[in-house]
Amino acid sequence: MLLNRTSFVTLFAAGMLVSALAQAHPKLVSSTPAEGSEGAAPAKIELHFSENLVTQFSGAKLVMTAMPGMEHSPMAVKAAVSGGGDPKTMVITPASPLTAGTYKVDWRAVSSDTHPITGSVTFKVK
């Protein structure tokens, strides 16, 4: 079947719209501390994304997954989650200083396209 010019333009525009929306998903660009890093306890964890975040739909959980010399199930760590100095940053601030161990931040980021993207960042505190 041959497409007339209007049908072709409509299909082309729809394809471009879908492509543009797919590119609008936020991606984690960097984190502080960095994925897999080991160092002193951070006062805060910063996640930097490729897109502006919709803060009311974005969030994170901080979990201690291992502690030196002890076996235990992952333990939730009380922390506040807020926006950073720019709309592409999420800040996780632990309620108390982090002790030695392995930590994981499970994050959920939503940008203007409203599709949630999830991921995690793991780091160790000496």
From Swiss-Prot:
Activity regulation as described: The redox state of copper bound to CopC may act as a switch between the possible trafficking pathways of the metal ion.
A GO molecular-function term, please?
copper ion binding
Q: Which InterPro entries match?
A: CopC-like, CopC/D, CopC_dom, Cu-Rt/internalin_Ig-like, Ig_E-set
Q: Where in the cell is it found?
A: Periplasm
Give a GO biological-process term. copper ion transport
Q: Which residues bind Cu(2+)?
A: H25, H115
Q: Name one Pfam family in it.
A: CopC
Record note on disruption phenotype: Disruption of the gene reduces copper resistance to intermediate levels.
Specify whether Signal is a keyword of the entry. Answer: yes
Classification via Gene3D superfamilies: 2.60.40.1220
Instruction: Give residues annotated as binding Cu(+).
Output: M64, M67, M70, H72, M75
The signal peptide here is: 1-24
Task: Indicate the family of this protein.
Answer: Belongs to the CopC family.
Q: How does it assemble?
A: Monomer.
Q: This protein is called what? A: Copper resistance protein C
Q: What is the lineage of its organism?
A: Bacteria, Pseudomonadati, Pseudomonadota, Gammaproteobacteria, Pseudomonadales
